[in-house]
């Protein structure tokens, strides 16, 4: 029951209205050697960071529920998201579909992603699933692992519908 509730909450969060806030185009210049990686990081910061947001404490890199995060928190968490999913474009797609992912604790995101990889047939399938519904990265890893057999199919159908009906796509 708890696993189904986690999945439903993740889906509901994805349909929450988008809040448009004043955002600076790029709050800092990235020094990554790969220009594509630097562009992805700058895009994530421009999309997710809020100028003037309080800096997160070192042990608590996450967004509050209002969705505000400083540029350094977004940058650090986004780089760790790239390492988790293994692809800068996929990571950018994830934060584009749910900006809050850029502020969630990276170890929690990794544990949840790994749980979805374990439940899906392939890593690519899990990546496609969480790219379409990034709220699934907020599910407790234990709930993902212990969910009933049909829950992955349900999650895929919901993610597909969310992707189909995504506003501004």
Task: Identify what each model region corresponds to.
Residues 1-22:
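N-terminal chloroplast transit peptides
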Residues 27-169:
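Long amphipathic alpha-helical repeat/alpha-solenoid cores
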């Amino acid at each position: 029951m708890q696993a189904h509730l986690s999945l439903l909450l993740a889906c509901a969060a994805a349909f929450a209205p988008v809040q448009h806030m004043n955002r600076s185009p790029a709050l800092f210049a990235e020094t990554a050697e790969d220009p594509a990686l630097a562009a992805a990081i700058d895009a994530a910061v421009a999309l997710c960071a809020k100028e003037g947001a309080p800096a997160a404490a070192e042990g608590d890199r996450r967004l509050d529920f209002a969705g505000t995060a400083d540029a350094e928190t977004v940058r650090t968490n986004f780089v760790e998201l790239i390492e988790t999913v293994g692809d800068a474009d996929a990571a950018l797609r994830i934060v584009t579909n749910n900006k809050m992912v850029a502020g969630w604790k990276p170890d929690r995101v990794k544990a949840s992603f790994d749980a979805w990889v374990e439940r899906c047939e392939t890593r690519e399938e899990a990546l496609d699933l969480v790219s379409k519904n990034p709220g699934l990265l907020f599910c407790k890893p234990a709930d993902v692992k212990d969910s009933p057999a049909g829950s992955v199919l349900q999650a895929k159908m919901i993610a597909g519908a969310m992707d189909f009906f995504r506003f501004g796509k």
